[in-house]
Curated annotation (Swiss-Prot):
UniProt xrefs under InterPro entries: ADOMET_SYNTHASE_CS, S-AdoMet_synt_C, S-AdoMet_synt_central, S-AdoMet_synt_N, S-AdoMet_synthetase, S-AdoMet_synthetase_sfam
GO molecular function: ATP binding; magnesium ion binding; methionine adenosyltransferase activity
Binding site for ATP: H15, D166, A167, K168, R234, F235, D243, R249, K250, A266, K270
N-terminal signal peptide: none
Stretches for region Flexible loop: 99-109
Protein's name in the database: S-adenosylmethionine synthase
Domain of life: Bacteria
Function: Catalyzes the formation of S-adenosylmethionine (AdoMet) from methionine and ATP. The overall synthetic reaction is composed of two sequential steps, AdoMet formation and the subsequent tripolyphosphate hydrolysis which occurs prior to release of AdoMet from the enzyme.
Species for this entry: Chromobacterium violaceum (strain ATCC 12472 / DSM 30191 / JCM 1249 / CCUG 213 / NBRC 12614 / NCIMB 9131 / NCTC 9757 / MK)
Gene, per the UniProt record: metK
Residues bound to Mg(2+): D17
Keyword ATP-binding: yes
Manner of cofactor binding, per the entry note: Binds 2 divalent ions per subunit.
Length: 389
């Protein structure tokens, strides 16, 4: 029987790029609490002892950006100079500009050539869903996220007191080529920052027993499964001291772990007038409902936009041969049941809420949090009825 391997990775909330993402989204949420129609493109850089806040923000909100950055760093767990990064001692610089009026006139309703709310930029976005896990996400990325979430949980509750905030996970699965479904886990990689007083053997055993085994389905682990725990042997220096972190540099971790294409636009720090974020969320919503409705076992949707224009320039669906009805019919159903204009997406998914901080670590998709409206499957009955299923 033919098999193939596929790998996805995740990173913890203490990874420097994720620190940057979380600061950007914390600032976005703080602004949306006071001004839900603000235009926000908040970028963050973190390095040893330094945080730089830059980008474009147009708002009536009165927000203490520097305070929010420090509070976010503290919540993540960088609260001691021994960790190489400390919310108290790091320098924070805020250098925001306002949104360009040339862009604003294309996005604001009643302005520009298209009087509807236009897209904030050109671009292409993808949504994806499959039946590999209960949340209709690919197996490797779903469980890679759960591993680093578990690492953070055990770090914060003190069960493994030598854990530090920075961590990465990676899962390689063996897939059945005939069914396209995962059969077993081939390799698990977990690297976690740690205090200098823990030896590698003790750390490795604890990580496998307390982090890896409670998370991964036991039926997917075989005697041949390889566990690579801190394979360099030491990971004391980490976080922003180990690497410079930037907003938007973990776009594959944020989405489908490489199982679906990515249009290239990052999410964190962007208000929902930016289709990089809102249309990617809508794409997930569409794809998940199509799979949940049984129209296909796998669904990938691409949407594209032109700056200042409300209607998408294209909508394409690929079901990889798993469809129960023709793809052309699925595209018709998408156009009928989902409003993919920027304003339509914002209303459909209620995106003007301060809900983005929670998205900034452990994946934007496949987490059935109450705020994550794009994970709802409330279009299933309508889709099935129109599809004749």
């Amino acid at each position: 029987m033919s098999e193939y391997l596929f790998t996805s990775e995740s990173v913890s909330e203490g990874h420097p790029d994720k620190v940057a993402d979380q600061i950007s989204d914390a600032i976005l949420d703080a602004i949306l609490r006071e001004d839900k129609h603000a235009r926000v493109a908040a970028e963050t850089l973190v390095n040893t002892g330094l945080v730089v806040l830059a980008g474009e923000i147009t708002t009536t909100a009165n927000v203490d950006y520097i305070k929010i950055a420090r509070e976010t760093i503290k919540r993540i767990g960088y609260d001691d100079s021994e960790l190489g990064f400390d919310f108290r001692g790091c320098a924070v610089m805020a250098c925001y500009d306002k949104q360009s009026p040339d862009i604003a006139q294309g996005v604001n309703e009643g302005e520009g050539l298209d009087l509807n709310q236009g897209a904030g930029d050109q671009g292409l976005m993808f949504g994806y869903a499959c039946d590999e896990t209960p949340t209709l996400m690919p197996f490797p990325i779903y469980y890679a996220h759960r591993l680093v979430q578990r690492q953070a949980e055990l770090r914060k509750d003190g069960r493994l007191p030598w854990l530090r905030p920075d961590a990465k996970s990676q899962i390689t699965c063996v897939y059945d080529a005939a069914t396209g479904l995962p059969k077993r886990i081939d390799t698990v990689v977990l690297s976690t920052q740690h205090s200098p007083d823990i030896d590698h053997k003790t750390l490795s055993e604890a990580v496998i027993e307390d982090i890896v085994k409670p998370v991964l389905p036991p039926e997917m682990i075989t005697p041949e499964t390889k566990f690579l725990i801190n394979p360099t042997g030491r990971f004391v220096i980490g976080g922003p001291m180990g690497d410079c972190g930037l907003t938007g540099r973990k776009i594959i971790v944020d989405t489908y772990g490489g199982a679906a294409p990515h249009g290239g636009g990052a999410f964190s720090g962007k208000d929902p007038s930016k289709v990089d974020r809102s249309a990617a969320y809508a794409g997930r919503y569409v794809a998940k409902n199509i799979v949940a409705a049984g129209l296909a076992r796998q669904c990938q949707i691409q949407v594209s936009y032109a700056i200042g224009v409300a209607e998408p320039t294209s909508i394409a669906v690929d079901t990889f041969g798993t469809n129960k009805i023709p793809n052309e019919k699925i595209v018709e159903l998408v156009k009928k049941h989902f409003d993919l204009r920027p304003k339509g997406i914002i209303q459909m998914l209620d995106l003007l809420r301060p809900i983005y901080g929670k998205t900034a670590a452990y994946g934007h998709f496949g987490r059935e949090e109450p705020e994550f409206s794009w994970e709802r499957t409330d279009k299933v009955e309508a889709l099935r009825a129109d599809a004749g299923l």
